[in-house]
Amino acid sequence: MALTLRKKQLDSIVRMLHLNQQLQGSPDGVGGGVGSAEEEEAYKILVMDSPCVALLAPVLRVGELRRHGVTLHLNIDKARQQVPDAPAVYLLRPTAANVDRVAADAAAGLYASFHLNFSTCVPRALLERLASATAASRSAHRVARVADQYLDFVCLEEGLFSLAQPRAYVALNDPAAAEADITALVDAIALGLFCVVATLGAVPVIRCAGGGPAEMVAAALDARLRDHLIAKPNLFTEAASTAVASFQRPLLCLFDRNFELSVGIQHDWSYRPLVHDVLGLKSNKLKLPEKYDLDDTDPFWVANSWLQFPKVAEEIEAQLAKYKQDVDEVNQRTGGGRDGVEFDGTDLIGNTRHLMNAVNSLPELTERKKMIDKHTNIATALLGHIKGRSLDGYFECENSMLVDGTLDRTKLMNLLRGNGTKEDKLRLAVTYLLSFETPVPSDLEQVEAALRESEVDMSAFQYVKRIKSLNSQFAGASNTASKVNIVDWAEKLYGHSISAMTGVRNLLSDGKQLAATRAVEALMEGKPNPEVDNYLLFDPRAPKSGTAGQFRGPFREAIVFMIGGGNYIEYRSLTELTQRSQTTKQVIYGATEILNGVEFIQQLSELGQKAGLGGVSSSLPPQ
C-alpha cells in the first residue's frame, strides 16, 4: 500500500465539491475525465472557516476550484450576500460558533441548499444544536447533507503534513499548564492523526518511547482507533481486507520534540530550510515582497530544493544560460538570426513549420523565464541575509559541534560578538549547550557573557540548561566527518550577480544522521536494537490482553510524527533514509506544526520566561 496522503486528501476534497457524488469517467474524480461532468454541473458556493482555508490552499488553487464548479469561495466569518439559486458546500471545523453561523445562514435562506462537511467528526451535541436551530427557523429542509470528512490536517506535499496546532511545545512543557488543557491538546493531536490514517485508509502499528507526550498521544489514538473499529462497516473496512500482515500496514512513529532539541534550533545550508528559516516560507508560499508559490508545480524547486545553496546558485546560472541558448535558436528559426539561413524564401512549407515550432515554444520559454527570475530573486534575497548575518559561519560552527563534536572557541566567540540577529546568537549558544555533555565551565561563562553583551534574552538558554540533564539524547549525534574551509561570503559575493555564487565551495553537512532518523530506521527494520527495544507498541487491531510481538516489523511504510513542532531539516533526513535504503521504503513526515529555528527558539524563550529564567541584561557577570 502506497502512502499517497496528498492525493487521497485531494480525492476527498474533490468528492466533497461534487456534493459527495462519485464522479464518472475518472476513478479518483481528480483527473481529466471529469471535464464533461463539470461542464454540465450547476455552479456552487464554497464556504469555509480560516483553518479549512489553510488545509485547502496547498492542494487546490482558485483555478482548480473553478474546474469543479466553484464560482465563489467565501469565509464564513465575513459578511456574505444571498445567492438563493445556488447550492453551498460548507467545509468547517465542528465548533459551536460554526454551527450557529450555519443555522443563521439557513434561516436567512442565503443559498438554495446546504451541503455541510466537517473537517473532523462532529459531536452529537453539535448535531442536536444544529437540528434544533434549523427546526426553530423552519429551515431544516435546506440542509441536504451533513458529512464527516476527516480532513483536519494540512498536506504541504505528498510526504509532508502538519496538524496546524501552534505552540504545542509550549503547551505540553509548561509546568503551570492545567491537566485539563494538556488532556485536551493530547486529544486534539490524536484526532488529527486519526484524520491522517483515516484518509490513508490504514490502521497503523504505533511505536513510541515511554513517558511524556508521545505515549499520551499514542494511548489516545489507540483508544480512538479501537472504538472506531468496533463498528462495521467503518473507515478502514476496505483496507482491513488486504492489510492482514504487519508488513502490509504502516508504522506510526511518535516522537516528542525533546527527543532531539538541536535539530529544531540549528542553522542549515540547504535551499529549502534556508528559504523557510530566513525568508519565512509558510504553507508553500513566500513573499519578498513578490508572492511566490514553492510547491510540486515548480520543477526547479522539486529538483533542487534540498541542494546546498551554492549548488542551487550554479543550477540557476546553468538554467539561465540554457534559456538564453534556446531563445537564440527561436530567433534564428523566425529569421532573427544573423545569417537568416532558416528562411531562404524558397521553402514555404519548411519556413512555416519552423515558424509554428517557434511560436509553440514561446509559452514554455516564458514559463521557464518566470521560474528562473523567481529563484534568482529568492537566491539574491538569501544572499543578502547570508552576508549581513554571517549565516555561513553559524552553520559551519554549529555543524562542527554537532557532527564532529569539536569546538572552535575563537569562531564561536566571534560569531556571538559579531554579525547576526539576537536569535542567531541565541540559537548558536543553545546549540553549543546541546552539543557537549559537560561544557567547560570557563567556555560556558564566556558564552553567557557574550550573550549579555549583545543584550540577548537568556530565557531559552537558561531553560535548556535546566532541562538538559533530563534527556541524554540532547547531546546530538556524534558521527565524525572531515572539515572543509569556507570562503568569506561578505567580501567576495554580496553585491555581485547570481553567477558570483557558483564558485563557492559547499559547506559540510554530511555524516550526521539525526536521532529520529536512526530510530525510525531501526523500528522499520524490526530487528533487535538497543536504541528502540524498549519502545512501547500499540496495535489497535490486536486484543488488549494479547501479545503484539509479531507486529514489530519489518515495515515498508512509516508515518513519522513530531509532537511539539517539526522542521525541514528532519524531513530531509527522513527523505534521505528512503533514498539510500536497499529495499523500497516510504516515509511520511508530519508534526503539530512546521517551525523554523527562530520560531522554535521563541517557544523555548517563552518557557524560560514562564519559569522565571534568564531575561535581558547588558551587564557582565561579576569577575
UniProtKB/Swiss-Prot annotation:
Annotated family: Belongs to the STXBP/unc-18/SEC1 family.
Function: May be involved in the early secretory pathway.
Gene: SLY1
Record-given protein name: SEC1 family transport protein SLY1
One annotated GO biological process: endoplasmic reticulum to Golgi vesicle-mediated transport
Gene3D superfamilies, per database record: 1.25.40.60, 3.40.50.1910, 3.40.50.2060, Syntaxin Binding Protein 1, Chain A, domain 2
A Pfam family the protein falls into: Sec1
Organism domain of life: Eukaryota
PANTHER family: VESICLE PROTEIN SORTING-ASSOCIATED (PTHR11679)
Organism: Oryza sativa subsp. japonica (Rice)
InterPro entries documented for this protein: Sec-1-like_dom1 (IPR043154), Sec-1-like_dom3a (IPR043127), Sec1-like (IPR001619), Sec1-like_dom2 (IPR027482), Sec1-like_sf (IPR036045)
